[in-house]
């Protein structure tokens, strides 16, 4: 056979070539002898090919000799052959007389015959198919007549080979080996035929295939045998024979009745080498699950094909499932958003120098403002700040702007002892400033060290400036409307923060000049006034959150440790004071908590202001949003307030305001007390009249307001309290107030001379006269600052003169429209020509904003108008923010001392700016003249105004 295997007869070679598609031919190792089977016919080939297709072909080998129920098993031809157990290792199959028997329906293994070494009958080679499975051993079998078996389990892994294992030949009756155990056993025709013959003669019932299968299923033959050394490559035997034997099941195939001769030939032909099994892909090898069912028979060549469709189906199903999860193109469509709202976001493109996302209104303002593109590129942030400020000021009602002026305008007295109480620290209004009245009204918490929570502008720095006075409300007929419509910057006063101890307050307010010792001694508020202020401030704070324009944190006058001075009104306001203080404290705490959580708007913080410690037992007072100094309440009141942090419902504000007004207003009807009402102005919620007091015939100014039409009732209370506490020769005095038939009547001192605006418009003033006006104004500011009040609207329109030349500050909200002379500038709502740069740019500010305004007013007295008055309001704001100190047209004509005075008053940096106390000591004050010298100017201005009105009347 010379290295080639002749398995098939010439007549059958053609038919088997297409059945067995994976025939392999191997070179015979030199030492290997061949076993062949010679007799074979076409019929046996067909049977063999079909049996190979059976997945259970491996089970027929063992069943063959035992299944006597099959007719094919009964017909066997046995040729006894004597094979000694110690036969030579090399013996040709042809030398042995091998019986041929048809043992099974088909013992097919369509594999080429591969040469193998002949080994003793009691030693066998483990087939690759079963090499990976544990093997069992059986006791030795009688040498010549033993049936050759190997206890091995099929395994799909055919890549490994093992050396021959000692396998004892056992009786099928004694050791019922499983079907899988016969896989890969070397084919020994002699032993098989001998066993079949013995079975036939004995006529003993053999176990059925069912029993055998059960045995194989119940008794696991997979015992791990010690791994033998690797065998020679040539000594590998295919399990084809055993598979072919197992594949035949007599009861299921009619072809099991073929002749013995044919079956015998088939059996011998299939005792091929094991090498073919190695070459089979794992997918073509029958598995145990496959061997359990013979109904689904597949050919060796189309085994894979039968699986592929199922696998593809599974894969496609799984892929479809994954696609549905990950990103299938069949996604549900999402509808477009409904009722979308586009929020404009203004940005700046540094490449093009253009703003993006500007609202149309802002674009129009910029185009009409006269601000060049170059300027916009150089200061983009300032432009945004100015636009925001301008929009806020122009959109607020004038009345609101007027009334919010003193909101939260108090600063803490840094010199006062720290509060010892545990209640939340509330700065008290009227507290003297450590820096003196000139120091800004910034409340200590507002100072850089104590960021204000919820303060307007707090996003920029801890104590953002309170909004500029909101809109120039119906200010006095004068230009009060020029007051920036934006709520006056909230006093630096921060919402009361229980966590900030008075001691922790900054030693100085930002931008506050150091006052000369004792210069600005804190002025204690009278208890009744403070209490009233507390009520009013509380009310004001509730409503001024968003639009209150604080006049700056009013410095809180320190409540002296000594008992407060009793006041006649103390009894009247004591009960209200306690109630108001508690309510304010609750609001302050709630606001502080909300601010810490980012819930409060910056405007809300404007209203809140810590009160300075009033005494050793200082009761934390809520910041008077209105800026009116508050009376420190008993310690008991403070803890109570802290216990109830929540604000009262906003709905109750109107009721609270009315109740508060009743407590602070006098009883009676003003129409019975005053006579001769003459209307001189009109505000948003009422008119301004002059009248004479019955009996004394004193001329007074009366403002009548309808509370139902007043949007900021709490601000009204604040203004009343501020004026009550601000009795000073240089401040328009508050006389009385009445609440009658739902209308509030406020009676104030009337200044017949009109405003300084008329004087500077129709007259040229000397430096001495200018110095006198500045001195009187500084004195009034010093007093306000000592009370913790920032006026924030110092300008010629709010400086009133008497016919004798006396000068007083006005516009505490109620005097806004008293002077009809201001009607000229009423249309210029919110144009802050006198405002400090820090206010325009929405930065933190303090009491020194009033000093800047005083310097601008000095220029106004020199030139007859403030700088940039001829510019558009928006451009004026832009120039104030970018130019800083304005340019004086004829500066060289001024004396050096006057220029020096202006230099310190108009410092852009509030820290370097002089305070009211500093300027009162400036050498320029030496040039002051007697106030009586102003009387002629006042009369001349009145005459000129009358003539102008007469011309207009014609």
UniProtKB/Swiss-Prot annotation:
It comes from the Eukaryota. Belongs to the protein kinase superfamily. STE Ser/Thr protein kinase family. STE20 subfamily. InterPro entries: CRIB_dom (IPR000095), CRIB_dom_sf (IPR036936), Kinase-like_dom_sf (IPR011009), PAK3-like (IPR051931), PAK_BD (IPR033923), Prot_kinase_dom (IPR000719), Protein_kinase_ATP_BS (IPR017441), Ser/Thr_kinase_AS (IPR008271). ATP binds at residues 680-688, 703. Residues 224-234, 463-475, 514-527 have a biased composition (Pro residues). Residues 334-347 form the CRIB domain. Keywords: ATP-binding, Cytoplasm, Kinase, Nucleotide-binding, Nucleus, Pheromone response, Serine/threonine-protein kinase, Transferase. Residues 1-165, 203-316, 440-562, 587-655 are annotated as: Disordered. Its main location: cytoplasm. Residues 18-28 have a biased composition (Basic residues). Residues 1-17, 127-136, 143-153, 203-214, 245-256, 265-277 have a biased composition (Low complexity). The gene is stk-4. It catalyses: L-seryl-[protein] + ATP = O-phospho-L-seryl-[protein] + ADP + H(+); L-threonyl-[protein] + ATP = O-phospho-L-threonyl-[protein] + ADP + H(+). One of its GO terms (molecular function) is histone H2BS14 kinase activity. GO terms for cellular component: cytoplasm; incipient cellular bud site; mating projection tip; nucleus. Pfam families: PBD, Pkinase. It comes from Neurospora crassa (strain ATCC 24698 / 74-OR23-1A / CBS 708.71 / DSM 1257 / FGSC 987). Residues 33-42, 57-75, 100-121 have a biased composition (Polar residues). Its EC number is 2.7.11.1. PANTHER family: SERINE/THREONINE-PROTEIN KINASE SAMKA-RELATED-RELATED (PTHR45832), SERINE_THREONINE-PROTEIN KINASE SAMKA-RELATED (PTHR45832:SF22). PROSITE patterns: CRIB, PROTEIN_KINASE_ATP, PROTEIN_KINASE_DOM, PROTEIN_KINASE_ST. It is an enzyme of class 2 (transferase). The active site is at residue 793. GO terms for biological process: bipolar cellular bud site selection; budding cell apical bud growth; cellular response to hydrogen peroxide; cellular response to starvation; intracellular signal transduction; invasive growth in response to glucose limitation; negative regulation of gene expression; negative regulation of sterol import. The keyword Hydrolase does not apply. This is Serine/threonine-protein kinase ste20.
